[in-house]
Amino acid sequence: MKIFRRPDLLFGPSGSCFDGFHAFATNGSTAYLYRFSYVQSALREKMRAGAPHGGEIAYVFGTLTAGRGVTPSAEDTAVSRMAHSYWVNFATNGDPNGPGLPNWPPHDPKKDLIFEFKPDGSAGAGPDPRKARLDVTQLNTEAGKRSDF
């Protein structure tokens, strides 16, 4: 059985995904880029590779107990409230920011920051630690070469 340990290469954000954000932001539109790296406390031992693709959905909708069979910790609930607040703010006024939330800046291709819901339950914008690896993946893909999985 092959275990795939590079989910960022499958689900992004891939280089082409970043290009889309760059194009969107460069044309005067506002885009908010994020990575969700938080894993529910009780599931961390099982999910050592990190948060799965779509892992933020249960946090955004506050459904942490649905089908998981675990009780959310206070930290899990706090991350869920934070994610929910960002999404509601964005849906309401086009800006995820609000009172009591860490600032989520719009994507700026010149600064190239990513907002991350971090493994420790905090959140904030900073340089993307995966950028160099994703740039290599993008270059190999554009050149018609298979990325090294």
Predicted features and spans:
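C-terminal helix-and-tail extensions that cap enzymatic domains
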Residues: 1-149
